[in-house]
Amino acid sequence: MKKIGIVGSGLVGSLQAILMAKKGYDVSVFENRPDLRKAKLLAGKSINLALSDRGLKALREAGIEEDIKAMSIPMYKRCMHAVDGTLSYQQYGKEDQAIYSVPRGGLNQKLMNLADKYPSIKYNFNRKCKDVELNTNTLIFENLETKEEEKHAFDSIFATDGAFSAVRFRMQKTPMFDYSQKYLDHGYKELVIPANEDGTHKLDKNCLHIWPRGEFMMIALANMDGSFTCTLFFPMFGEKSFDTINTKEKVSAFFNETFADTIPLMPTLLDDYMENPTSSLVMVRCSPWNYEDKILLLGDSAHATVPFYGQGMNCGFEDCTIFGEMLDAANGNWDGLLSAYSKERVPDGNAIIDLSLRNYVEMRDLTGNKEWLLRKKIESKFNDLHPDKWLPLYSQVTFSHIRYNKVVQNGVEQDAIMEQVMKLPNIEEKWDSQEVMDKMLSLV
């Protein structure tokens, strides 16, 4: 039986372990940290994730789609909070289409518990990856409990150890390996809207709440316990930034001016802001994602992105399903498979980073913009009439399995068409008229 080593027991690593075990492989998973199922889950690293169709497909293949949906909250639309407290809504897709707010820790635990049911999967915690012997495909770990060095050789290795992957660091020293990382000027901080005393939510739980403010924004996603996890995306430095808004007095003044409608909802705001960590946002691009037929990067180790399309986990899960499909198509023959996968998938990894950056501008600058909202209404109406001719960009990313790279190309074409449509005289009054729909039909 082929022996598989997986470095990293996070979401992608645990899912890949399950999918490989289902295909009959012997899998060993190594994790730097202790078993998170025995640790208290701490805030800091986003505890809500937006699960959408690409990720759901992978969970379906693992056999736990319904289990995960049962611990998540469907979000059917965005709710935009203006500075004056006015609310406006935008449907994500068709009436029944939703993205799901799912707790990172709970999802990770569920995947690990499912993996434990496979006798062919073994978890090894407190193992820090120090190096990889490429010629023998041997992983070298420090056992953090005994302080001893351990060596484990495998037929194939999957690196799912995140944006600062130790395995990728070794691959970076090989010839012709391209690598870049870039930090966003903005970071993020987690805050909380607690549940009402009776355990109900203070805001509509079936919306993703956004406070768009131009240079920055805050979002809130519902938790099963009635609370919301809020994330403030804010410049790291500058006049209004994490660097300068650094006392309780300044935080109070800033929120009263900028997010006034949240003040009554957030009784622990000042303590949360001062005590919770400020985290940075990093993007990683690299190529190739494989080393010979031995090692393959999956998830953030290959393509760490920023969270503004809610696609980090979904893209990582899609990595696993696409690899599985290619392995099946090759009838289990690994010769040249990792290289073929890398060539196929790298353009999509780059594309989701580009799409995520674009969506950040859209979320913080445009969701409050009347012209942008009108454009979205026109697109939605045309999509209702001609679903075979037009799928809005957001739906292509979130509710389809179209390759991310193709989505980028489609987006460029759609932008060019909508630019012409938005220039039509009196478009604000006649946006849903037959004339406008016919014009779009002539352009697609």
Ranges and model annotations:
Residues 325-444:
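C-terminal helical "tail/cap" subdomain of flavin- and related membrane-associated enzymes
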Residues 70-74, 122, 259-274, 331-340, ...:
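Acidic/histidine metal-binding catalytic segments
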Residues 21-43:
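Glycine-rich FAD pyrophosphate-binding loop
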Residues 12, 35, 164:
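Conserved Rossmann-like nucleotide-cofactor binding loop
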Residues 2, 21, 52-192, 442-443:
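Conserved N-terminal helical subregion
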Residues 113, 118, 127-131, 136-281, ...:
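Conserved FAD-binding catalytic core of PHBH/FMO-like flavoproteins
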Residues 9-22, 158, 191, 277-368:
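Conserved mid-domain beta->alpha element of the FAD-binding
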